[in-house]
């Protein structure tokens, strides 16, 4: 049984939905709070969490009368308590408090804590059978099989909040699993779509941060430029929808209007379209199984005029090939892929390596990990976190020689 509900069940909706937002002060959290703000009669806030932004967290807690808030940075606990003095909001700090937020009795949970730190709080929500809007990629990339099996066992409902996976989620409802031929994830191609590989190698940080369509954080914008983000999305789609690598294609679509497509056995292709605005997939998750009014701009296809497509270039973007390789290898390889990429991107931002070295460091780390015979099925959150830690250390150790080769 899948934890992703591919058939709409109208009986699942309730009049007033209690909501928890894990990562309320980040970009996804901000978009979620924007939607909650627009429909106060539909939602009640149970819990909110943040990493270290006390001011923003306290402000949200007061605005939405949150019952519980948690700050991950324990050094900020006293400041948070002082900011909420005189309110009825309970406060907590540290990893255990963030996990408690996920475990509290909310109907719907936005899992938007970034990094491996988001895995255990999301699992806390999953274990009590909540509706979980999943925006944390580590839950799937680092622990996909384990996470989805645990969700299905608990009767949790996993709602994909990422734009591409949400598009597939909507399109997959048009047929049955045995009728599916393939899913197609679209990619803008990023700022280097038409660049020569030699020029991409030398790309600067400023150039990598000029995304043509989306406004995102620094890390994900660089991942888009390298197409590592699309590799991560391929991995996520595999675990979310129980797909083999051969059932997942990537198609470059520079306009970012079609977010995902599904081909069925009768050769019908069902697509989801929309303006590039993260609030649209979040609104779909927040309203599910109903639809709520969203704030995104109305899609005007006549004004856009033309939608174009092209195959991805694996020479320009080797990170995409490595994602498929790691997915086929399995047994923790996707965790290594993600961890090595995070180390590589941080090194690029710090000026320690060239842009082209990002994929080389990921490949070197994967090869080193496979040679070491470390492949093993991940059966717990701690297993995933351990592999993530080992991979980061190996990537950091390999970094100097990768940087030297590129110089």
UniProtKB/Swiss-Prot annotation:
Keywords for this protein: Isoprene biosynthesis, Manganese, Metal-binding, NADP, Oxidoreductase
Pathway recorded for this protein: Isoprenoid biosynthesis; isopentenyl diphosphate biosynthesis via DXP pathway; isopentenyl diphosphate from 1-deoxy-D-xylulose 5-phosphate: step 1/6
Family: Belongs to the DXR family.
EC id: 1.1.1.267
Binding residues for 1-deoxy-D-xylulose 5-phosphate: 137, 163-164, 188, 211, 224, 229-230, 233
SUPFAM superfamilies xrefs: 1-deoxy-D-xylulose-5-phosphate reductoisomerase, C-terminal domain, Glyceraldehyde-3-phosphate dehydrogenase-like, C-terminal domain, NAD(P)-binding Rossmann-fold domains
UniProt binding sites for NADPH: 25-28, 53, 136, 138, 217
Substrates-to-products reaction catalysed: 2-C-methyl-D-erythritol 4-phosphate + NADP(+) = 1-deoxy-D-xylulose 5-phosphate + NADPH + H(+)
InterPro entries: DXP_reductoisomerase, DXP_reductoisomerase_C, DXP_reductoisomerase_N, DXPR_C, DXPR_C_sf, NAD(P)-bd_dom_sf
Names of the cofactor(s): Mg(2+); Mn(2+)
An annotated GO BP: isopentenyl diphosphate biosynthetic process, methylerythritol 4-phosphate pathway involved in terpenoid biosynthetic process
Ligand binding (Mn(2+)): 162, 164, 233
Protein name in UniProt: 1-deoxy-D-xylulose 5-phosphate reductoisomerase
Role: Catalyzes the NADPH-dependent rearrangement and reduction of 1-deoxy-D-xylulose-5-phosphate (DXP) to 2-C-methyl-D-erythritol 4-phosphate (MEP).
HAMAP family registered for this protein in UniProt: DXP_reductoisom
Pfam families per record: DXP_redisom_C, DXP_reductoisom, DXPR_C
GO molecular function per UniProt: 1-deoxy-D-xylulose-5-phosphate reductoisomerase activity; manganese ion binding; NADPH binding
Superkingdom: Bacteria
């Amino acid at each position: 049984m899948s934890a992703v509900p591919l058939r709409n069940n109208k009986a699942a909706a309730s009049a007033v939905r209690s909501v928890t937002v894990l990562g309320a002060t980040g970009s996804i959290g901000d978009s979620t709070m924007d939607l909650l703000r627009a429909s106060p009669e539909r939602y009640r806030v149970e819990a909110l969490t943040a990493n270290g932004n006390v001011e923003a967290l306290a402000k949200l807690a007061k605005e939405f009368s949150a019952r519980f808030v948690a700050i991950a940075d324990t050094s900020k606990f006293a400041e948070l308590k002082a900011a909420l003095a005189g309110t009825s909001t309970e406060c907590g700090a540290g990893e255990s408090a963030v996990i408690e937020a996920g475990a509290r009795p909310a109907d719907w949970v936005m899992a938007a804590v970034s990094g491996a730190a988001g895995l255990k709080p999301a699992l806390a929500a999953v274990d009590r059978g909540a509706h979980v809007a999943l925006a944390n990629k580590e839950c799937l990339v680092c622990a996909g099989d384990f996470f989805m099996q645990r969700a299905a066992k608990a009767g949790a409902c996993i709602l994909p909040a990422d734009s591409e996976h949400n598009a597939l989620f909507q399109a997959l409802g048009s047929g049955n699993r045995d009728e599916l031929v393939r899913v197609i994830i679209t990619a803008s191609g990023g700022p280097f779509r038409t660049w020569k590989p030699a020029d991409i190698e030398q790309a600067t940080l400023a150039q990598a941060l000029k995304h043509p369509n989306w406004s995102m954080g620094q890390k994900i914008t660089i991942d888009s430029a390298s197409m590592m983000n699309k590799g991560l999305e391929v991995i996520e789609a595999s675990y979310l929808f129980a797909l083999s690598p051969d059932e997942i294609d990537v198609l470059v679509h520079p306009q970012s209007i079609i977010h995902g497509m599904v081909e069925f056995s009768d050769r019908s292709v069902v697509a989801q379209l929309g303006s590039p605005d993260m609030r649209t997939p979040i609104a779909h998750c927040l309203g599910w199984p109903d639809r709520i009014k969203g704030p995104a701009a109305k899609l005007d296809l006549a004004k856009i005029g033309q939608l174009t497509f092209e195959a991805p270039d694996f020479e320009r973007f080797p990170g995409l090939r490595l994602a498929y390789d790691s997915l086929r290898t399995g047994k923790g390889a996707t965790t290594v892929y993600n961890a090595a990429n995070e180390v590589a991107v941080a090194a690029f931002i710090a000026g320690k390596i060239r842009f082209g070295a990002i994929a080389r460091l990921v490949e070197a780390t994967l090869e080193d990990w496979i040679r070491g015979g470390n492949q093993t099925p991940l059966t717990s959150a701690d297993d995933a976190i351990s592999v993530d830690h080992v991979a980061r250390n190996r990537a950091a150790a390999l970094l100097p020689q990768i940087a030297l080769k590129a110089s």
